[in-house]
Amino acid sequence: MFKNKKIMIVVAHPDDEILGLGATMHRLINSYNVNTHLLILGEGITSRSDNRDLKKWNSELKIHKQNIMESKKLIGYHSISVNKLPDNRFDSLALLDLIKLIEKEKKKFKPDMVF
């Protein structure tokens, strides 16, 4: 069922790719030779303050980016797209814009399945 398939993983925040699917994806990559593309929608940190200020959280966002690259190596994800949608504020976005973002990645990667 999974052998040599293309799987796109869509997560809301950095670290969801580890907590939610990390072990499963690691197994599928190593045992079934799946090709993976990880799509992270949100930046994962600015909701810790009242106002969304990317400059204020710049050093933490850099650490997040390093952690994402480390998870790519550990799990074995083949490619990653990281977006900077507002953390825990997806409801402030037009649903169509969110769908278009996911569909654009899906069209580019052409997965057999999406998690």
Give names to the regions the model predicted:
Residues 1-109:
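Active-site rim/loop-helix segments in enzyme catalytic domains that contact anionic ligands
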Residues 109-115:
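Short N-terminal targeting/anchoring amphipathic segment
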